[in-house]
Amino acid sequence: ERTHTGEKPFECSQCHKRFTRDHHLKTHMRLHTGEKPYHCTHCDRHFVQVANLRRHLRVHTGERPYACELCASR
């Protein structure tokens, strides 16, 4: 519902950016605190968001899940 109304009741106390969901604010706050709870088991990299860790892991696995629509190259 908030998506359609534009309501963003959750505000960052540091930079005043606003969010529709409380968990989006919690994730955002890690940018200010420097907390990076997701770490790569293959190297020393740490990440704020788990999605960024998953994308990074492809460096180690060689996975290339997206194919080019024009030439099918990955």
Curated annotation (Swiss-Prot):
A zinc finger (C2H2-type) spans 1-4, 10-32, 38-60, 66-74. It comes from the Eukaryota. One of its GO terms (biological process) is segmentation. GO terms for cellular component: nucleus. GO terms for molecular function: DNA binding; DNA-binding transcription factor activity, RNA polymerase II-specific; zinc ion binding. It holds the Pfam family zf-C2H2. SUPFAM superfamilies: beta-beta-alpha zinc fingers (SSF57667). Keywords: Developmental protein, DNA-binding, Gap protein, Metal-binding, Nucleus, Repeat, Zinc, Zinc-finger. Gene3D superfamilies: Classic Zinc Finger (3.30.160.60). It is found in: Nucleus. SMART domains: ZnF_C2H2. Krueppel is a gap class segmentation protein. Belongs to the krueppel C2H2-type zinc-finger protein family. PANTHER family: ZINC FINGER PROTEIN, ZINC FINGER PROTEIN 271-LIKE. This is Protein krueppel. It comes from Euscelis plebejus. The lineage of its organism: Eukaryota, Metazoa, Ecdysozoa, Arthropoda, Hexapoda. The gene is Kr.
